Amino acid sequence: MGTSRYFVRKTTIPPPKRPRRIHVSPCHDTPILFGDEVKRCPWGHLAYGGSCLQSITLRDSETSMEELLPHDVIEYHIMVRLDVKTLLKFKSVSKQWMSTIQSPSFQERQLIHHLSQSSGDPHVLLVSLYDPCARQQDPSISSFEALRTFLVESSAASVQIPTPWEDKLYFVCNTSCDGLICLFSFYELPSIVVNPTTRWHRTFPKCNYQLVAADKGERHECFKVACPTPGFGKDKISGTYKPVWLYNSAELDLNDKPTTCEVFDFATNAWRYVFPASPHLILHTQDPVYVDGSLHWFTALSHEGETMVLSLDLHSETFQVISKAPFLNVSDEYYIVMCNLGDRLCVSEQKWPNQVIWSLDDSDHKTWKQIYSIDLIITSSLFFSAIFAFTPLAVLDKDKLLFYDSTHGDAFLTHDPDTKSYDLPYTSNRCATVVCYFPSLISIL
């Protein structure tokens, strides 16, 4: 006798007092004999034990999901394949489902699965959007909109993410980590780690550098050099997330040490110093970049205009120079930039009429390979001439480059190296700082 096949019919969730059940009905006439193993039926749907599960929704029925499938099958083979928004809705199915979805181990498996299986593009997050013209016309308008997100290749409009810190100026660390982003202020406000998809957030206190800077601000004093910016990343061995401030402390008149490094510990909710700190001065004008368990900085320019890439291993908390940058005789530190493209460490230099982007070879950490070249003549004809180097953000559709001018933050460009074409996929009348991220359920306990 042939095995029946079923799919789940989409219906509305019943009233709370009625049991929430799964309704199943036949999908196709041909038997699917897979045995008790999750696979895909000939029509591409998930299947288990010969039953085709075309979708997972809820309705009143005689048979519960747990009776149809063991929970470990549901968790490891079905729930892990669902996107974040769907899983957030499914938290109301049962206490067991909620417990699973809130489990850090499940959240990590779900993220790993989607990053390995999905070819989808990252989301773009705009931080502290600001329209100076609108404020001048109407002083009642809020100065800043905290967060707004969009997908570059989507026709959908950008979406505002409500937060408790509207109308406050925040900046964002250069790279996201596991769907988390880190907001910071130079000295006015405490920092915040945020999951923009789930809207979870956690505020943490100022580091010692920020406290000194705040004291200077109250006395209307300022530093004689550019202010440093923090980095945010993850110890891949322990799974611990770490915000890091590295700065040239002697230049800032903070102490007599060339550099000082502070790391925040979420377990103790306190900052601590890293000893020894960096053996090299860094460029404060450049944001640190997180790649594969380490944060990276440019070292200060030599008299010949050379710079090196400095790395901090977030597990051992040790510094080392991993490579010389592929460019020589840098005339201005604002003409170079570091970034993460597809989990690869990349550096770029603007030198008219091009801006070239190199990727560091993962095998030897010494060889640089040119992967993109931006035609500055074409980009300047599209909207304006960039004062500083463009900031590369992400790779879309496997090879299309997304980048923007960080001094304005109101226009984004894509470059297709195959067709050598350029496009303006998103523009805004408001300035912002920007970071890319992939949706996740991750939070920091």
From Swiss-Prot:
A Pfam short name: FBA_1
UniProt domain F-box: residue ranges: 64-112
Top-level taxon of the source organism: Eukaryota
InterPro entries for the chain: F-box-assoc_dom_typ1, F-box-assoc_interact_dom, F-box-like_dom_sf, F-box_dom, Gal_Oxase/kelch_b-propeller, SCF_F-box_component
PANTHER family the UniProt entry points to: BNACNNG10540D PROTEIN, F-BOX PROTEIN CPR30-LIKE
NCBIfam families assigned to the protein according to its UniProt record, in alphabetical order: F_box_assoc_1
Name this polypeptide is given: F-box protein At5g10340
